[in-house]
Amino acid sequence: MNAYQNKNITIIGLGKTGLSCVDYLLSQQANIRVIDTRKKPTGIDKLPQNIPLHTGSLNQEWLLESDMIVISPGLAVKTPEIQTALKAGVEVIGDIELFCRAATKPIVGITGSNGKSTVTTLVYEMAKAAGVKVGMGGNIGIPALSLLNEDCELYVLELSSFQLETTYSLKAAAATVLNVTEDHMDRYMDLEDYRQAKLRIYHNAEVGVLNNEDKLTFGEGENQARQTVSFAENSADYWLKTENGKQYLMVKDEVILPCEEVTLVGRHNYMNILAATALAQAVGINLDSIRTALRHFKGLDHRFQLVHQANGIRWINDSKATNVGSTVAALAGLYIEGKLHLLLGGDGKGADFSELAELINQPHIICYCFGRDGVQLAKFSSQSYLFETMEQAIEFLRPTLQSGDMVLLSPACASLDQFASFEKRGEEFTHLAQYSA
């Protein structure tokens, strides 16, 4: 008899992740109920008809009758109904915990405020180039539980702080917290509360890959890996060498690749490459395979992506910059011949925007602010314009563009005040950029 057979388990949240929990727990012969606080949740048409479903609110009676609750990462454990269930002795976990209990192959775990998806995909491509049967999922692509149905020798998981809050059995072969900057301050008490959720990835990890430029990423207490390696621009195991005007990606004294041979550009991307290389080497991927993957990797959509170039003007879609730290990373070390037309705005999730002030208060940077927190953002630039929508901002700036200029959507905010997702925001920007031709 398995651990879940005949257990009363309530799954909170439908969508792809919730449905993966349903499929997995049905295969384990559990008694399942599903709750979704939305009245018409996505995925409702894919739920087997014999599964009891409650929508529109949290059903406290169902929660208290459960042996276990599998909670969506989108719902805080601090929610009163969940706290009541916990106090009554009900176990509360997430889908990643279910996965970790079942997985028998090594796991690479990646978290951080920014760069998670790029690093996760890089490690996946490096493993593939080495001929490893590798599965990628978690907070990117397919739900982690769906990977159990695949023939994998290695799992590469992107993990959010929300997912890590309800994960207890992760024993990563290699893990990293790429960086810690303010994000989701509408859910966490403060930056330290958010950081502690991230650091859980190091609990029982074999190798921790540390960002030597960000001490907030260092493990502490029980959340420390058994061994550590580091990455940074200088003074680290994986580092960036500058010689005769050229930059090189290095591991100790060995050249990984000259930066000019990789398609990703920008200092923040070089740091992502170093972190990914460290993780890949920690699980036995050889440098030749790593080099092959790096030469072919084109980057991900909506991450500092060149979507249009004409008349000497570049349009860059960085819609995935949903927090201040991501926009700071995009702006750091950015060289522009002409003016930078920076599009900022959306839902700031309670973040402090003041870190942007020094970076954006430059003679060559003009800010175009929009969305829910556009007014707040506009205060930090002496050259700012305020609009209701991104489209209005672009139509305003379009006639002013000259050769050498860059239009950069790096909003420092989430998109949900005006768009269905950051992807939809990026797609609209791309459409408007290409319309300018």
Swiss-Prot record:
InterPro entries: Mur-like_cat_sf, Mur_ligase_C, Mur_ligase_C_dom_sf, Mur_ligase_cen, MurD
The protein's enzyme class: ligase
The keyword Ligase is annotated on this UniProt entry: yes
GO cellular component: cytoplasm
Catalytic reaction annotation: UDP-N-acetyl-alpha-D-muramoyl-L-alanine + D-glutamate + ATP = UDP-N-acetyl-alpha-D-muramoyl-L-alanyl-D-glutamate + ADP + phosphate + H(+)
SUPFAM superfamilies noted in UniProt: MurCD N-terminal domain (SSF51984), MurD-like peptide ligases, catalytic domain (SSF53623), MurD-like peptide ligases, peptide-binding domain (SSF53244)
GO molecular function: ATP binding; UDP-N-acetylmuramoylalanine-D-glutamate ligase activity
Biological processes per GO annotation: cell division; cell wall organization; peptidoglycan biosynthetic process; regulation of cell shape
Enzyme Commission numbers on file: 6.3.2.9
Role, per record: Cell wall formation. Catalyzes the addition of glutamate to the nucleotide precursor UDP-N-acetylmuramoyl-L-alanine (UMA).
Name of this chain's protein: UDP-N-acetylmuramoylalanine--D-glutamate ligase
Organism of provenance: Haemophilus influenzae (strain 86-028NP)
